[in-house]
């Protein structure tokens, strides 16, 4: 049984209880998260970068997302799972875009997430919500628009940009989103937005005042020693621990210490 549902997001904001979300892409990681206290899982299109080595999220496709959502849902059937709508999948005609939503939901997502709040997106979100499908918005640094934004950089610094982010957040809430991700926006702006809309905000690089926080599993475990944005706290030195385990394995194989005849052999 799933431990969390969409009304719980609203309740947790009302009760001032923080929401924890982890981005996860695979079965074995999801199995670990399923045994943790983390509230919910995002299967993000960032898998194009983290799992496949691309420089942007753009190569993620609906089918790739569906395969990873299936894997995560098998590993964490007790967690609320959000599936990212990948690049351009919701910028097509309504039938094609809804087919993409259907694919992700049938793969095991309980909600979808999409980036931006222009007129096209708001109309599409309205249709999806009216179809009974929960939607999370995403504002600030929206990686699918990376070439328009000019890189992975903080958004909303200028007054006009901050005003637009506030208006977009209100529009997403009014259109029916049950939460919104705020990525790489100034802390004060994120706090203002959080206090100005009824739905929860989930921050990543948006300060401590948001309704919750999301980090990519591999990032919080410290598995990439080359990746250290300002917002990231590594809760484990995963790179060094995993590397040491591999080196220990290598040494024991080469010294015939492993496998031990009495302990590891049949």
Curated annotation (Swiss-Prot):
One of its GO terms (biological process) is pantothenate biosynthetic process. Its cofactor is Mg(2+). The keyword Magnesium applies. InterPro entries: Pantoate_hydroxy_MeTrfase, Pyrv/PenolPyrv_kinase-like_dom, Pyrv_kinase-like_dom_sf. It catalyses: 3-methyl-2-oxobutanoate + (6R)-5,10-methylene-5,6,7,8-tetrahydrofolate + H2O = 2-dehydropantoate + (6S)-5,6,7,8-tetrahydrofolate. It is found in: Cytoplasm. It holds the Pfam family Pantoate_transf. The active site is at 183 (proton acceptor). Its EC number is 2.1.2.11. It is an enzyme of class 2 (transferase). Keywords: Cytoplasm, Magnesium, Metal-binding, Pantothenate biosynthesis, Transferase. One of its GO terms (cellular component) is cytoplasm. 3-methyl-2-oxobutanoate binds at residues 45-46, 84, 113. Belongs to the PanB family. HAMAP family: PanB (MF_00156). Catalyzes the reversible reaction in which hydroxymethyl group from 5,10-methylenetetrahydrofolate is transferred onto alpha-ketoisovalerate to form ketopantoate. Homodecamer; pentamer of dimers. This is 3-methyl-2-oxobutanoate hydroxymethyltransferase. It comes from Coxiella burnetii (strain CbuK_Q154) (Coxiella burnetii (strain Q154)). The lineage of its organism: Bacteria, Pseudomonadati, Pseudomonadota, Gammaproteobacteria, Legionellales. The gene is panB.
């Amino acid at each position: 049984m799933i431990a969390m549902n969409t009304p719980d997001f609203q309740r947790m904001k009302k009760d001032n209880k923080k929401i924890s979300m982890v981005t996860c892409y695979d079965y074995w990681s999801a199995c670990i998260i399923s045994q943790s206290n983390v509230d919910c899982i995002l299967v993000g299109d960032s898998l194009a970068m983290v799992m496949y080595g691309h420089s942007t999220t753009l190569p993620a496709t609906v089918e790739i997302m569906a395969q990873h959502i299936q894997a995560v849902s098998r590993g964490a059937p007790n967690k609320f799972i959000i599936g990212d709508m990948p690049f351009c999948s919701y910028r097509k005609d309504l039938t094609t875009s809804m087919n993409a939503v259907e694919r992700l939901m049938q793969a095991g997502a309980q909600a979808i997430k999409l980036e931006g709040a222009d007129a096209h997106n708001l109309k599409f979100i309205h249709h999806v919500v009216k179809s009974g499908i929960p939607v999370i918005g995403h504002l600030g640094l929206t990686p699918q628009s990376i070439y328009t934004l000019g890189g992975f950089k903080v958004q909303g610094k200028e007054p006009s940009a901050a005003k637009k982010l506030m208006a977009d957040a209100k529009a997403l809430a009014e259109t029916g989103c049950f939460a919104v991700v705020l990525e790489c926006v100034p802390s004060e702006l994120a706090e203002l937005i959080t206090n100005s809309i009824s739905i929860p905000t989930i921050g990543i690089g948006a300060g401590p005042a948001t309704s919750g926080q999301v980090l990519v599993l591999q990032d919080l475990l410290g598995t990439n020693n080359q990746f250290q944005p300002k917002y990231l706290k590594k809760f484990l030195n995963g790179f060094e621990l995993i590397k040491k385990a591999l080196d220990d394995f290598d040494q024991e194989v080469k010294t015939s210490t492993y496998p031990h005849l009495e302990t590891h052999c049949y």
